[in-house]
Amino acid sequence: MGTAIPEEPLGSTEKSIPLVGFGTVEYPLNEAFKERVLHAIKLGYRHFDTAASYPSEQPLGEALAEALRLGLVKSRDELFITSKLWLTDSYCGRVIPGLQKTLKTLGLEYLDLYLVHFPVSLIPEATYPVKPEDIRPFDYEGVWEEMEKCQELGLTKTIGVSNFTCKKLERLLATAKIPPAVNQVEMNPIWQQKKLREYCKEKGIHFSAFSPLGAVGTNWGHNRVMENEVLKQIAKAKGKTVAQVAIRWVYQQGVSVIVKSFNKERMEQNLDIFDWELSAEELQKIEQIPQYRGSRAEAYLSENGPFRTVEEIWDGEI
């Protein structure tokens, strides 16, 4: 019997989001990816997070189909699948086809959550590494209107955003008929996002955290979480790992968290966060940790805009 992961309702929708999700971004993809997804389901994971820009959509879909065939889950309704609109499709006329392509790749009829991956657009022909001349401003009103249509058509149960600041959410909400159900952003003890969390709470937007351990191994990740002395001391005192303390801290802030590991032992450890808690004193110590934003998104800077500086990308939230 796997771990029962708590869930939280998303706004006024009928969907509830599991408060711990399984991240699938990896370059190159782990050879044992599909087997690890099946193992994750056995452990109790039900929320799987992917994106059009990740190489994991197709193998994730294959693994989910296998899980259903094996009876590891009784029905598609037991799963919560998130994917994200890529920047080359962040235009009027490309959003719905972009989601339809994602659904075909995953082999699914609908998503539970579809996110705008980042508030910027790239020309449809753009490839990595991003060239400054390929960057375009994000059409808040036009793209979001098509995201709303995706939900109305039943292609996704809910819609949301990722990497949006308070200012960018304010701009989106000014014209949105359906407000974003979720804002998925970087958050961990080293980057606590207090201002943005308060804003999302005030607006009824569920806050979801990626990179709870600092995204070690990515091109922008860091080891500041795993090497932090405050977290190490708390972990030692509690007989837990630093990773467990960091994930528990995020969970204890009342937000959902996307964890990622293909190591079977750590996959299990990442779920061992529900039957213990951090004390008020420990929370206070963590709150005083010096802050550092890992994901700065410098790839989207251009002398011609829309973002000329990192400060402009994050509206000073750095």
From Swiss-Prot:
Pfam families: Aldo_ket_red. This is (1S)-1,7-diacetoxy-luvungin A aldo-keto reductase. Expressed in flowers, maturing fruits and in juice vesicles. InterPro entries: AKR, AKR4A/B, Aldo/ket_reductase_CS, NADP_OxRdtase_dom, NADP_OxRdtase_dom_sf. Pathway: Secondary metabolite biosynthesis; terpenoid biosynthesis. The keyword Oxidoreductase applies. CDD domains: AKR_AKR4A_4B. Its EC number is 1.1.1.-. Belongs to the aldo/keto reductase family.
